[in-house]
Structure formats: C-alpha cells, structure tokens
Regions:
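Active-site core of glycosidic bond-cleaving carbohydrate-active enzymes
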Residues: 3-86, 90-191
Length: 194
C-alpha cells in the first residue's frame, strides 16, 4: 500500500475480491480455490502437483487483500482475508521443520523428502523447487513463522542452515528474499547474506 488512490478503488477492489472468492471451476486465477476456501489449504491431488506453491501464493495475495480491505474500512472482508492468509500454518510439519504437502484427508503426504525437487526435478506439492525453497516463503508473517518454528533462535539457525548446506537457490523466486529475512530480528541484520 503506497497510498495510491487516483483510480476507482471500489471497482479495483471488487475485481481483486472476485478473483479471491470465485469458485475454482470458474476461476482462472485460482483454479484450486474450492479446497483453499473450504479447508484453508490446497491438498495434494496428484503426485507432482503444485498444491503448496499455489496455496502460498494465495496466502500472500490474501494478506495484500486484507491490507487493502482494512484501509478501505471493509472490516468483514479484512477479517476473512487475514484469517485465510494465516493458513500457511497448515503445511508446517514439526517432524521436518519445513512445509509439507497435505493430502485430501488432511494428513501429511508420505513418504516425504524435503530435498526432493532440487535442480528443478519434479516434487510433490512444489513448483520448480523443493520444500526448503518454499519453507520461508511467508513474507507477510515472518515473525509468525518464527514462532511456529519454535522461536527466533530456531528460525535463524534453520535459515542459516539453508545457506550452509547449499539449499538456497535464487534461480527460483520463492527463496529469493531469504538473504534478507535475518533483518526482521533485532541484532541479526549482520547475518543477512547480501
């Protein structure tokens, strides 16, 4: 939100809202929107679909819609989009400390290898990457993700490990901001990998 208001805000907002709430069969922007709206996540329907990747994009978009709705005084919509934007937590798997695909029955996909998908090989739930390329892809709730991971120290250590083990791959957009995530935490900006 940069405060730009020199256009028809209501029409623009309604178009954005429509793309976020239209059922999947009719929705070219969010083809798997039915499950997303009803379950809060996109389940893995086929071995190499992009369910987690799609959902993460929706969460980020919904957070942007929350911000816009809130600025326009649309409290009910703001509440809806904020709640939806926090759905990334469904995918967090404590066993691996990463995001992990979820099956239609709500259980985690198994067997799971968070490294599957390196070098753009097919990966269940992730587009052109693996779980490590997407686990920190929650730019709208970095501190919330840190809490989910067990706190700031665990978050920082896990993020550092991504660099130390060579899991960081700037060739794919989801982890392109990883080097800067350290700066969200007081006293850690010096660890930013720039």
């Amino acid at each position: 939100m940069k405060g730009l208001r020199d256009f028809d805000m209501e029409t623009a907002y309604e178009a954005m809202r429509k793309s976020a709430t239209l059922p999947g069969k009719e929705n070219l922007m969010r083809p798997d929107n039915d499950d997303y709206m009803s379950k809060g996540y996109v389940p893995l329907m086929e071995q190499f679909d992009n369910s987690v990747s799609h959902a993460l994009e929706y969460y980020i978009a919904d957070y942007a819609l929350y911000t816009l709705a809130k600025s326009m005084g649309k409290k009910e919509d703001a509440d809806l989009f904020y709640k939806r934007s926090m759905g990334y937590k469904h995918y967090y798997c404590k066993e691996f400390g990463t995001l992990r695909p979820i099956l239609p029955d709500g259980k985690f996909y198994s067997p799971f290898d968070p490294l599957q998908g390196q070098n753009f090989e097919p990966s269940p739930g992730f587009h052109e990457g693996n779980s490590w390329n997407y686990t920190f892809y929650v730019p709208h709730d970095v501190k919330g993700l840190a809490r989910l991971m067990g706190g700031q120290k665990k978050f920082i250590d896990k993020l550092q490990m991504v660099f130390d083990k060579g899991y960081y791959d700037p060739a794919n957009e989801p982890d392109i901001a990883y080097p800067y995530l350290f700066s969200y935490f007081k006293g850690k900006i010096g660890r930013a990998h720039v």
